[in-house]
Each structure stands twice: as structure tokens, then as C-alpha cells.
Amino acid sequence: MTKSLSEQLFETAEGLLPGGVNSPVRAFRAVGGVPRFIDRAEGSRIYDIDGREYIDYVGSWGPMILGHSHPQVVEAIRKAVERGTSYGAPTPGEIALARTIIEAFPSMEMIRMVSSGTEAVMSAIRLARGFTGRDKILKFEGCYHGHGDSLLVKAGSGVATLGIPGSPGVPACLAELTITVPFNSNEAFRKAVDRHGKELACVIVEPVAANMGVVNPRPGFLETLRELTRKAGIVLIFDEVITGFRLAYGGFQKLCRLEPDLTCLGKIIGGGLPVGAFGGKRTIMDFLAPNGPVYQAGTLSGNPLAMSAGLATLETLRSRRDDYAALDRRTADLCAAMGKLFRTAELPVRINRAGSLFTVFFTDSDVFDYETASHCNLERYARFFKGMLDRGVYLAPSAFEAAFVSFAHSDEDLEKTLQACAETIKTLGGNP
């Protein structure tokens, strides 16, 4: 049997790249089969090198809220690249993008550009430690904040996908400085602050967890974090790498009306190009070099291509800020229709949604933290993923990731997705 081009390329890649990929979840280990090698993308669609077309709900893991190859973003990149790819010097674009982000996030008075969400988080934590003079940090089980050493303890995303409790290579002394408590547990958080509060530099949280699948904060949870960190002099960091500009123009903090001390952003603020940023109160940000003693630097920080793509993306989103509600409703309608198909087939699922993000958990129990997420039926999700893929719908190749609906998804796309879902359910033993 003739192998597909994706199969041939993957065999070659396995001899050149660990696991054949440059990020573990792409290897399809959790769902089986061969990863699709993508040739191009436009709007709501991606196309693999074998010529197959898919309705894309991965969206480069979130930033493609406008759809792939958006004309204004592409044009901004084209104009920027004609002027040079990187200077290693300040550019006007840095100021324009910084001002745009700060105007959207009242909690930010200053911002520092970096090259990835991971780098933003690592730098924000270093800054919090330098500002407070404390060493310990607190994170929540199942929340993923990039692959920084201190943050791989009980993490989500690819760590959860591969079933890894942490990661070899992370020194025990670093892990000991990371306190973990269950997401959505006010009681556990209070106990941790009571015990470690005087040693904690920061508390970092995804305000909506999106890397153990989508898990919303319970009422009062984030408010408790804000109250107790403020009382204990602990820096509160919102990791909005996924939720920033995705759930609202101004991030989830605009919706929950809470202001963290620091915010981490990524992905979307570069229009899908490599970028990240962290920002917050001037009193904290002034501790960064060259103003202060906390060192952070990067050759490609604020590079002109990412700044141009990011500014074009955010300007477009700003002009469409009133359209977020409609996008949320369309996503809610899609999730409701999918839920009805599963119920008719008597297949136990929980579909968690936050704005235009959602996750299908194959479980008969509510999912509100990492423990409950980990009880979902991974084998059934893998079969669901493959069935949808075979029918032209590209979902995350992991049960612990989010699906993303974009402004580019049409009514026809959603109808085709539901049809694919109905057909796939039949292969899972259902009869909708």
C-alpha cells in the first residue's frame, strides 16, 4: 500500500527530530496514527500535504481568532519583512503594540515584550521573586504555564497528554520551591497561604484553565486568590497566554473584573508569530533591568515582524470587540448541538465551554479540576478524534486541550462539524 506524504515525512522526521516533532503533542501519541503535515491554511481551513482539507479547531493553539492568513495580518507582515526581519534595536512597532495592549488591560501600566508565552511566564516569576525577595511560588494542578523548570510540577497540556507527573531534568530543589494545590479549591488555597504565605513570591493561575481541557473557575475562586494574595503581599499573576484577547478584548480579567499584579500574554498578540509579553503595575515592572536589578533580555524581543502582525491583529479585534458576544453564542450553540447528539446516543460526556473555547470530556462526572479531568475516557476521545479527522474536522490531538472557534468559522463549517460528529458517534457505539 502506498504511504501518504504525511506518513513518508513523519518517518523521515523521526530520524531527525525527537519523536518526529518539535512539540510533543503534535506526535499524535495520545490519539494514535500519523500526524498530518500541513501545507497551508486559510480562514477556518487547513490543508495537509496530501491535499486533504480540514475545518480547523486548533487554530495554532488559540491565536488564530481571526482565521488563518487574515488579509490585514498578512499585509502587515509583508510590509514589515520588506524593511528587514530583525534589528536588535528599538522600533516604533514596539511602542504601538505596547500602547494597544496597555489600553486594553487596565491592570497593566508597563509591559515587556518577549518571544514566547513560556518566556513571559518565566520572566514574570523571576520578577516576582526579585520584587518580593521570596523564593517559593504557588501554581494549580493541571494548569500549564510553559516548560519552565519550576512550572512542570503537576502541569497540564502536553505533560498531562503524555501522562508525565513532572519531568526528569528538573532538580528536586527547584520542585521543592513550587507549591501545588487543586484548581477551584478555596480551602486548599487558604491552607497553602496560611502555611507558606511568608515564603511565597507569587501565585500564578490560568484564570480559565485551558490546558487540562477547558475548566472554568468556580464563583468566588479568583476573588479568593486576589483577596489572600493582596493581604499576604504575594504577587498574583494571571497567565492569559490563551485567554488574553480570546475571551474578550481585554482578556478574562475584564470579564471577571479582577486586576492581577502581573499578566502574561502570548500567541495572539503576535498574530500567530513567536511572541510573548508580561506586564503589570509600574512599581513591580520598574524592578526590571535596566531600571532595576532583575535581569531579563532577549535578542528577538519586540522583533518587527511579530510587532506588525500583532498590531494588525489587535487593531482588527478592537474594531470587532462587540462581536465577541456573537462568537460566544455561536460556540455555545455548537456545543449544545453536540451535547444533544451525545445524549441521544447515550454516550456520557461533559462539554466545558468558556467563550469560544470548549472541550469534550468523555465522562459522566462534572469536570472542575485536574483530578476530575484525568478520569475522562482517553481511549474514547482518541476514537472520537480519529473519526472527526477522517471526516475533515481537525480537533486537538489530546483530550486535555481546548478547541477554538474563530471569527472565520462559518455556519456551513459548524453544520459540517455537527454532521461529522453525528457520523463519528455511530462508530463509538451510539445511534443518534
Curated annotation (Swiss-Prot):
It is found in: Cytoplasm. It is an enzyme of class 5 (isomerase). GO terms for molecular function: glutamate-1-semialdehyde 2,1-aminomutase activity; pyridoxal phosphate binding; transaminase activity. PROSITE patterns: AA_TRANSFER_CLASS_3. The lineage of its organism: Bacteria, Pseudomonadati, Thermodesulfobacteriota, Syntrophia, Syntrophales. The keyword Isomerase applies. Homodimer. GO terms for biological process: protoporphyrinogen IX biosynthetic process. Belongs to the class-III pyridoxal-phosphate-dependent aminotransferase family. HemL subfamily. InterPro entries: 4pyrrol_synth_GluAld_NH2Trfase (IPR004639), Aminotrans_3 (IPR005814), Aminotrans_3_PPA_site (IPR049704), PyrdxlP-dep_Trfase (IPR015424), PyrdxlP-dep_Trfase_major (IPR015421), PyrdxlP-dep_Trfase_small (IPR015422). It catalyses: (S)-4-amino-5-oxopentanoate = 5-aminolevulinate. NCBIfam families: hemL, PRK00062.1. One of its GO terms (cellular component) is cytoplasm. Its cofactor is pyridoxal 5'-phosphate. Keywords: Cytoplasm, Isomerase, Porphyrin biosynthesis, Pyridoxal phosphate. The modification N6-(pyridoxal phosphate)lysine is found at residue 267. It holds the Pfam family Aminotran_3. This is Glutamate-1-semialdehyde 2,1-aminomutase. Pathway: Porphyrin-containing compound metabolism; protoporphyrin-IX biosynthesis; 5-aminolevulinate from L-glutamyl-tRNA(Glu): step 2/2. Its EC number is 5.4.3.8. SUPFAM superfamilies: PLP-dependent transferases (SSF53383).
